[in-house]
Amino acid sequence: MLTLKIFVYTVVIFFVSLFIFGFLSNDPARNPKRKDID
């Protein structure tokens, strides 16, 4: 039961961090900094 809880927490944290990372990476794309990448 403890292993299942740890697995669930790991998956939740993974998706939350992935969502936050995607949100933060989308912010600079709208800024003029995108021209530097191109």
From Swiss-Prot:
GO terms for cellular component: chloroplast thylakoid membrane; photosystem II reaction center. It is a single-pass membrane protein. It holds the Pfam family PsbI. The chain crosses the membrane at residues 4-24. The keyword Thylakoid applies. GO terms for biological process: photosynthesis. The keyword Hydrolase does not apply. Keywords: Chloroplast, Membrane, Photosynthesis, Photosystem II, Plastid, Reaction center, Thylakoid, Transmembrane, Transmembrane helix. It is found in: Plastid, Chloroplast thylakoid membrane. It comes from the Eukaryota. HAMAP family: PSII_PsbI. Belongs to the PsbI family. One of the components of the core complex of photosystem II (PSII), required for its stability and/or assembly. PSII is a light-driven water:plastoquinone oxidoreductase that uses light energy to abstract electrons from H(2)O, generating O(2) and a proton gradient subsequently used for ATP formation. It consists of a core antenna complex that captures photons, and an electron transfer chain that converts photonic excitation into a charge separation. PSII is composed of 1 copy each of membrane proteins PsbA, PsbB, PsbC, PsbD, PsbE, PsbF, PsbH, PsbI, PsbJ, PsbK, PsbL, PsbM, PsbT, PsbX, PsbY, PsbZ, Psb30/Ycf12, at least 3 peripheral proteins of the oxygen-evolving complex and a large number of cofactors. It forms dimeric complexes. This is Photosystem II reaction center protein I. It comes from Chlorokybus atmophyticus. The gene is psbI.
